Curated annotation (Swiss-Prot):
Skewed-composition ranges (Polar residues): 38-48
Keywords: Coiled coil, DNA-binding, Nucleus, Repressor, Transcription, Transcription regulation
Name of the gene: ASIL2
Official protein name in the record: Trihelix transcription factor ASIL2
Ranges of residues in domain Myb-like: 84-144
InterPro entries in the cross-refs: ASIL1/2-like (IPR044823), Myb_DNA-bind_4 (IPR044822)
Subcellular location: Nucleus
Role, per record: Transcription regulator that may repress the maturation program during early embryogenesis.
GO biological process entries: embryo development ending in seed dormancy; regulation of DNA-templated transcription; seed maturation
Disulfide bond positions: none
Molecular function via GO: DNA-binding transcription factor activity; transcription cis-regulatory region binding
GO cellular component, one term: nucleus
Motif window: Bipartite nuclear localization signal: 290-303
Length: 443
């Protein structure tokens, strides 16, 4: 299937025989109920013995000159609707390659494949069913396989490829793919390094990376990192012209003392012409680094070597006449005392900080103890108040009960007196009535 599609993509040089027969042949369409039975008979008797021969002769003859097929649609040089022509494949490769480069030679996503399918289907001379993103992706895979086959054939000595899309794919995914160059200057140690495309083989990528790293690194970067200053020594300072001592200009770092800057190079200028040769550049740089390190050690030793006046005077005698005068002894002693005081001050600061922390801890502890005592006192007061409240409540309850009982007793007594009075009054009334009746009877 892949070979068939690759053959169709090369053009109309080898069309599909099943879809469009070549010129010179005649295509005959026969409609019959069943497969006819043919027999080997002479040409003269074929019309008499075979009744289907007349029907074959009367049917219309169709040539293969790009006419219509059995369904009435134009063939257009192809039989299948999903076959790819050379023009469609070219448009597909261009659209895919553009997005492939935009993604830094990465894989396309579904939206990119849909855009590619729309571009392929929107051609002016396109009259078939629109291509889908899946068809475009499968076609690209087929073209890549064809490209790999061509590469293998060329590697085996097959000569230059005649495939029309070979050069285009070789520029996109081959080893000859162009790498974007730097458009701006070097901005740092690795500022000129750019992203290397992943389509390049691993060996080429590593070599290119090392070349760019070497080109982006300044020549004196390592030396500057070692001595902390710019140390560019011209070759003329060590030239073997045989002249006087110290011929040539030297750019010495300003961090080196004047005596060290003057004496070593004067000695070097006097000794090298006697030898009659020049040192290599690497050896010169090594000597320069050594002198700078010795000068730094000398400066550090000079700063700390002020224990006695004799040592300070010896250090002062080592200086040359063109150096600056050393500071007075009293000033140096004051500086050392100030440094010691500064050191003591740092220790005092730490001690003061420790004391402040201790004082803060003590104050915090006292505050917590006071809070705890206050809570205990408040709890005692609360218990005392509750006890007094309960006592008052009991007293009030007892007093209330006593008053209620007294009221009940008084009410009972009052009710008894009332009943006695009523009985006596009734009795008196009866006696009065009886007396009245007796009086009436007597009258």
């Amino acid at each position: 299937m892949e070979d068939d599609e690759d053959i169709r993509s090369q053009g109309s040089d080898s069309p599909d025989p099943s879809s469009s027969p070549p010129a010179g042949r005649i295509t005959v369409t026969v409609a019959s109920a069943g497969p006819p039975s043919y027999s080997l008979t002479p040409p003269g008797n074929s019309s008499q013995k075979d009744p289907d021969a007349l029907a074959l002769a009367l049917l219309p003859i169709q040539a293969s000159g790009g006419g219509n097929n059995s369904s009435g649609r134009p063939t257009g040089g192809g039989g299948r609707e999903d076959c790819w022509s050379e023009a469609a494949t070219a448009v597909l490769i261009d659209a895919w390659g553009e997005r492939y480069l935009e993604l830094s030679r990465g894989n396309l996503k579904q939206k990119h494949w849909k855009e590619v399918a729309e571009i392929v289907s929107s051609r002016e001379d396109y009259g078939k069913i629109p291509k889908t993103d899946i068809q475009c992706k499968n076609r690209i895979d087929t073209v890549k396989k064809k490209y790999k086959q061509e590469k293998v054939r060329i590697a085996n000595g097959g000569g230059r490829s005649r495939w029309v899309f070979f050069d285009k794919l070789d520029r996109l995914i081959g080893s000859t793919a162009k790498i974007p160059t730097a458009t701006s200057g070097v901005s740092g140690p690795v500022g000129g390094l750019h992203k290397i495309p992943m389509g390049i083989p691993m060996g080429s990528r590593s070599n290119l990376y090392h070349q760019q790293a070497k080109a982006a690194t300044p020549p004196f970067n390592n030396l500057d990192r070692l001595i902390g200053a710019t140390a560019r020594v011209s070759a003329a300072s060590f030239g073997g012209s045989g002249g006087g001592g110290g011929g040539g200009s030297v750019n010495v770092p300003m961090g080196i003392p004047m005596s060290s800057r003057s004496a070593p190079f004067g000695q070097q200028g006097r000794t090298l012409p006697q030898q009659g040769r020049t040192l290599p550049q690497q050896q010169q740089q090594g000597m320069m680094v050594k002198r700078c390190s010795e000068s730094k050690r000398w400066r550090f030793r000079k700063r700390n070597a002020s224990d006695s006046d004799s040592e300070s005077e010896a250090a002062m005698s080592d200086d040359s006449g063109d150096s600056l005068p050393p500071p007075p002894l009293s000033k140096r002693m004051k500086t050392e005392e100030k440094k010691k005081q500064d050191g003591d001050g740092v220790g005092n600061k730490w001690r003061e900080l420790t004391r402040a922390i201790m004082r803060f801890g003590e104050a915090y502890e006292q505050t917590e103890n006071a809070k705890l005592q206050q809570v205990v006192e408040m709890e005692k007061e609360r218990m005392k108040f509750l006890k007094e409240l309960e006592l008052q409540r009991m007293q009030f309850f007892v007093k209330t009960q006593l008053e209620i009982s007294q009221l009940k007793q008084q009410h009972g007594r009052r009710m008894g007196n009332t009943s006695n009075d009523h009985h006596h009054s009734r009795k008196n009334n009866i006696n009065a009535i009886v007396n009245n009746n007796n009086d009436l009877g007597n009258n």
